[in-house]
Amino acid sequence: MTAAQRRSAIYDQLTAAQTPISATALARQFSVTRQVVVGDIALLRAEGHSITATPRGYMIPAETGLRRTIACHHSGEDTQKELFAMVDCGCTVVDVIVEHPVYGQLTAPLALSSRYDVEQFIHRMKTSHAQPISALTGGVHLHTLSCPSEAVFAHLKATLANMGMLYDAD
């Protein structure tokens, strides 16, 4: 298999996948190193393919649902509650965004669609002793969401407001 054929096969795998695929799994499948897969992904992106790196692996972002952005504010301890509220309302948490004073906007892909996804994300945060990216901004952050409808987004905003997590600049 040539490198170009491998890249095409990797893209086909990602397109067909319902969940993210790790670079390690792709490396095993194609009998190459993880670094080769990372390079292949970079080349596929350079060709114009939309490939997202999530904490669970690579994926092709689904273009379903309404894209909405919501501003939130809470402590790191409340991250799981916030994310559960979002997925329980039927939304996919696409990413988290913070505004850094030097780097500007920092965006981290999440792709969380279920309680299981959230639990896995929180587990990785705890076992790696990592702080949420919102720790850089005192808990203020944005989420890009994919929502099934405007009604669901409105319900989520009301839910987060009741939880005291919806950011209000006042």
Please tell me what each predicted stretch does.
Residues 51-62:
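Minor-groove-contacting beta-hairpin "wing" of winged helix-turn-helix DNA-binding domains
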Residues 65-170:
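Mid-protein regulatory/catalytic core that forms ligand/cofactor-binding pockets
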Residues 1-29:
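Extreme N-terminal segment that seeds HTH/winged-HTH DNA-binding domains in transcriptional regulators
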Residues 48:
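Conserved functional loop/turn residues at catalytic and ligand-binding sites
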